[in-house]
Amino acid sequence: MGDREAVLLEALSRCGLRGLSQAWVDSVWELDFTETEPLDSRIEAEITENGLETFSSLHENLLAFASEDPENSRSVWLLFSENDICRNSLVALLSHFIQAAANKKANAIQRILALNAAGLYFLLLEIPGSVANQVFHPVLFDKSVNALEKCWPRDPNASRKRKKDTLKSSQGDNRGGRKRPRPPRRDEQEMEDLSEEEQDEEEVYFSTRDLMHIRDSIFLVLKNFLRLLPKFSLKEKPQSVLHCIQIFINLTSFESVPQEMPFSDAVSVNHMKYVPELAYHGLWLLCLPIHGEGNQTVRRLFQRLLSVILMMKGGEGSNSALLVISPPVISARNQAIRFISFLVNELKEGTIPVLNILLQHICVKFPDKADYRVYAAQALVKLMENLPNAEYAIFIEWLYKYSKNSKISYRVFALEVVVALLDLPEREADVSLPHENLNFLQHKFLLQHMVFSRCSDKAPTVRSKALSCLAQCLEKNSTTAIDGVQELLQGSSCRTVFGTNITETTGNGTVYASNANEATTHPQKTMATLKIIEVSDTGDTLSSDGKEVLTMLRYRAGDEKTNVRKSALQVLVNVLKCHLIPCSSEDLSTLQDRCRDPAVSVRKQALTSLTELLLAQPHSVLIQKAWLTGLIPVVLDTESSVQEKALECLDQLLLQSITHYKRFKQDDERQKLTWDLLTLLTSESQDLSRYLTKAFHLWSKQDKFSSTFITNLISHTETEHTAPAWMILSKVAGSSPKLDYTKILQSWERVSRQTDADINTTGHILCVIGHIAKHLPADTRTHLIDHVKSWLKEFKSSPEVISPAVEALQKLCHAQTDKPEDVQDLLNDVCGEIVSACEHHISSVVMADCKDEPLDQDLLVKHLFTLGEVAQLCPAKVEKRVLLLVQSILASSVTTEQNSCHSDAEDPPVSQPLSQFKGSNMPSLIRAHAFITLGKLCLQHEDLAKKCIPALARELEVCDDVAIRNNVIIVICDLCIRYTTMVDRYIPNVSVCLRDRDPFIRKQTLIMLTNLLQEEFVKWKGSLFFRFVSVLVDPDPEIAKFGEFCLVHLLLKRNPVMFSQHFIECIFHFNCYEKHEKYNKFAQTKRERTLFSLKGKENKDKRMKIYKFLLEHFTDEQRFNLTTKISHNVLACFVDGILPIDMEANELLSDIFDIMSSKEIKLSAMRSKPGEDVGADDDEMAMANAVMQAAQKKLISQVQKKNFVENIIPIITSLKGFLEQHRIPAVRDLMNYLREMMQDYRDEIKDFFAADKQLAAELEYDMKKYEEQLEREQEENVQNPPSAESTGSPKGSPRAVNAISSPRSPNAPKSPLSTNAQTPGGAAPCTPITTPRVSILKGQGPRPRQMSLSTLAILNSARKAAQDNKKQRSKSIGAQPSTPSPARTTSSKQVTFRSEDQQSDSSLVGRMISTPDVTIENVTFGAGVSYISASQTPLSGRRGSIGSHEKERDVLCIMSPDKPAPQPRKWNVESPVQRRSIRQRISGKAPLKPSN
């Protein structure tokens, strides 16, 4: 025993404790180890020289005292006292070395010494009696623990790496609307970089050996510390516990562990080999009861592990940063999750509440970036596995309410969690679980209530995520998912709760998010420890049925956001694939429409979805047709990737399964599907086969068609697949290698002899012959030429076969010789015979005198059609007689001519009918085909075209037969390509057919005009544009939809300014307003005006539909310019007096104000909320885009506000006064526009009116009265629904209730109010005895404007005072309530009193409102009510009878009887110079002349 003590004393003596100054020791303790004076350099050098050995020896000797039983051994503290060794000196010395390691410049020896010193300090604490001897000091303890981390050398580039490798947390900075911090100045940044470089230069270099020694020292000291923890209680030292937790957590990622760490209490520290293992063991030891009762330590531990799980670095709030996702980071996260699970299993019930809180905080603090969000959701689900069923159900209930929080990112995260939960097996219910919680254990609940309810979320990202989750669940074919969706589709009680509050009460503040229907984000405060996050449910329950589910899916397939549409398609297809509902035409139509979606990704998804659905249900003919209709036209897609996808799907289903007929099996579903699809292409869907030509052309470039493929096809030509096999052969023959022509020629020989051969098959065979003509021997070609010619001359085939036959004949002749002259000679010989045969038969029919013989119409049609086809190949063989014969067939009958002459006498026709042959009475079928033939002849004979084109245009007007009008349209449009200048003047005649009574003609005209406009054979001249866009309101919705497609996808792309150039004139044209000097000045007949007129209130909705459609496809620049143009070129004309303000202008102005108030005219940056959906965006660029969008919106908003204030407000305010003055109902729409604008530009409007407070007060008063009027109307509409008589009454502003004729429109309709003001006996409405004179001074700014008394109380007072003071004469104005009830309009009198002075004196026009022209006694105006000049006030009709002249001249000025008597009115004397300056200032802001 004595030897051991002697050795210890020897080791202590080598530490030089006796040489330490007592003053230095005392200062170290007094300063609480925070600051120290430098140690005597001699003593430090002496210890450092043999420091490692000294500290190791001391550690070894002290360890014996720590490990022995204190009862059986002598106390070391007694030994210190007996030998006069000051323990404070030893502790102070150790602290000096521990402190030295904190310096970045510390070398390897200093760091190792620091670790050894920290180990010695831990050993001193481990020795019994250390607390009583006051060895423990919290600061030194924390520094010793800190040494475990600080002694490890930091990477010299760590500071620079941190900036690159960490990402700013999207949820960390929750400062709401505060300004962003000022970026560092460039010079400051450069200085910081220089200082960092200097520090880097001063960094000490560590060799590998040094690093190994330091690592080993850390490992040994950490083991010593872990030996201390079970013995040394930290229960009273919570800050030290917290510090230990943080250091241990940092050490868990100190080095990589090759295998999965076993977390177990049974594992000995001595068996651990890695620092992270020791660190986790240390965390486990800190959770023991010795260091704290309850779950406080666990709570602190979980809070610190939260950042590891979320892969974040730094503290919470604005200081947090995201770690780059890497294998070490993911490994640390996984270890933390496993350790938490270990703790929960070990500590049981005590940790469950804390785990529940941790789960809640994961939901609230996850990084809002796609990858991090997924990892956080997976971590949450793994931790949820540790919850018992009861707690699991409670948390799911919390999560359900959380999923409806107002923050978009929360709702998206809830969906991520649900997706991960659905991957786990469903939990089985316990007997002890309350019945109301059973639902929360079921996957069905997650699917129906948490996924499906979010499919209609107002945030696009949430909708997209929910639909994507739903699609994933169905794709996995899990029974629970399918059952859950099945219940939804069957309309079981699916309840959706809206309205959830999340409240988190902490010591520092509260996190609060109000309503799920308000996507607002509230600040999140930093919390000291984990606190429970409470979620309250305040919403109503809504149920949905199966029809609503399908309706929702179809609606979402047309959502404004690309990702939502794409996800909706996936869900819809998976629902159909799983046979949860039968395929309906509506569902398939939705999929077909998405094949033409504007977004590339949606088009690709639609192609994939349709193909998957067809493969899942290959026997459904409905799906087969939908697949063909949706997919085949996409081969013409302008986007190459979409085109390639379509070709891939076509190749997969149409080509790959074509094998030799010998290997064809009926039970092979893929082969059967291929031939079913090809058969449809030759029958019901044969119109789509023309698109296949493009596909086969593209495939031919890829050498898709081998000789084996051709052989396989030919093997099917004499089987039940004959028609589709020949159809495919006709497409591939032109690009395929040489074929076995024998089989093809034999088929032609056989088919040509059959009288009942299939038309399509015959045409395809002839097409194949044309393709292989150049490969045939010369004698075979000669034989075929004669054969085809003879076959045509028999005239037994229908027109559908004649065209391919003539084309084959042409190709055979071209292949026969190489010289063009010889080819034409051959064609003249061959085709000349056919022309002669046609001429002979047509002549015999036309010239026949016998009327009794029945006409063989089919035969004549065949001759006419053949003539038109072959005449184009040999124009020299077509004689004038042939032309006259065709014209004679087309000559109109006498009856038709006479009718047409009287049909439109006032508008002489621009063209004359064919008049050479009168009395021709050919059937419509013959005439229809004859027009086609004539058109083909005109293509080769220009003189004939000059003669026939006017007659063709006239035929469109007079002919009633649909087939004839259709063919004439086709002929005129084809001739327009050949003779553009000649036909151009007759394009208006063709465009009239857009209003044809037959839908087929309207659509055909639309197609033909679109083709001409695309190729620019026709320009947008005259009324063509306005007639074209009128198709948007076609009564047939299919035609209207097709018109939208033509305008947007075909024409607007070629001419992006097309809509903006014609927009203003659209307003004039559709309102039939022709008084403007520039707009709507093209020539039209009365019939054309009537056909295309959209004038009147009954067509208001149609006009607005056109306007809004055009505006939706404007660019922002075009929208911005349009507002200014409307103000300067239209509204200013009314203000300047260039255009009269009358009832004819009412609808025009009403449309303009509705357009200017519409959301479509607002700039896109102003309509959308920047960043409203960025919170959950998967794209890193989304955040940057949101910032750009916000800056763009701010800039555009400033420019738009400036434009509004400088260019629009002056004109609008001036025009408002004029409209009120003339009682034009459009003033109501103006007020609505002002109300909309004042919401956006209230401050700017106040600034503008700062110089004219009178005008500002009047405008504010008017707006107030207008809003009161709207409220009254809404209340009356609820209480008393409007009758048929009152619904037609135009509503004006508070000042413009009665609309009457103005002097500029004497024939304008009277106000509907005058109709209501009739006597019960039906007397005619009263009219004013004089017409008020209107003086519009050109170039003058807005005059002082007049206000009406629109308050019902004042009106009642007026009536009462009128009975008492009939003979009193003064100035006033009578007014009515804006929306009189039927009872009131029939029982009260409308009285307008005027004095003689008012009727004659026009000098009062410019008088200020506050200056009386005569003395007023005992009467005054109500507060805020202006005077309205007599010469500007129209008279209202007076109900009752047309009374005496004296009664009508009675005048009364009144005020409310209960008002106090007014003070005598003062004169408002104002300098004319001042008044002139004010007017000039106002007019200077309003350029009232049209700008060019």
Swiss-Prot record:
Cell division is among the record's keywords: yes
Region (Disordered): 152-201, 1269-1345, 1359-1406, 1454-1492
Ranges of compositional bias, category Acidic residues: 189-201
Sequence ranges of Polar residues compositional bias: 1277-1290
Compartments where located: Nucleus
Annotated GO biological process: cell division; meiotic chromosome condensation; mitotic chromosome condensation
Keyword terms of this UniProt record: Cell cycle, Cell division, DNA condensation, Mitosis, Nucleus, Repeat
GO terms under cellular component: condensed chromosome, centromeric region; condensin complex; nucleus
InterPro entries to which the protein is assigned, alphabetical: ARM-like, ARM-type_fold, CND1/NCAPD3, Cnd1_C, NCAPD3
Swiss-Prot/TrEMBL HEAT repeat ranges: 543-581, 583-619, 621-659
Any matching Pfam family: Cnd1
Gene Ontology MF terms in the entry: histone binding
Listed transmembrane segments: none
Role according to the record: Regulatory subunit of the condensin-2 complex, a complex which establishes mitotic chromosome architecture and is involved in physical rigidity of the chromatid axis.
Protein name, per record: Condensin-2 complex subunit D3-L
Organism: Xenopus laevis
Name of encoding gene: ncapd3.L
